[in-house]
């Protein structure tokens, strides 16, 4: 049973039936998974109450390749919804059809985008300030992917969540599916 359209997209497992995975176990599962895909490595893993989140980068370029979610109880690994699927010009679902927001003849899957990482950070800050006008907001350095940036942010000194900024349009996509931050581990 799911929690609805915007809720958890996987089967919730009550804690009394299945024990929650720890971050090290999730890292091992992710390493095994990406070893079958080829030239990728894990950049970071974050643990939230609803899932584990991982940034996967290309070994040869260091560029963000894609984002994955891991169910904290079953260990099922899935592509993260949102920008990872819709804006990712190289590994997303539009990589064969080209990006739907930009004419195909104007862009290919390279690392160049009209919006810089600093501009993406400013766009993210402005967006968050409109939602949390009285909070102390700090936006961390963005992770760069093919077509967009993903940024973690803090409210009042604590990691609160993340959002993505399209590198061509400046559109913001808030990651509402993670819930409360627990911990993170940087790997590269």
Task: Locate the predicted segments by residue.
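Long, terminal "pre-/pro-" and other extracytoplasmic accessory regions
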Residues: 1-188
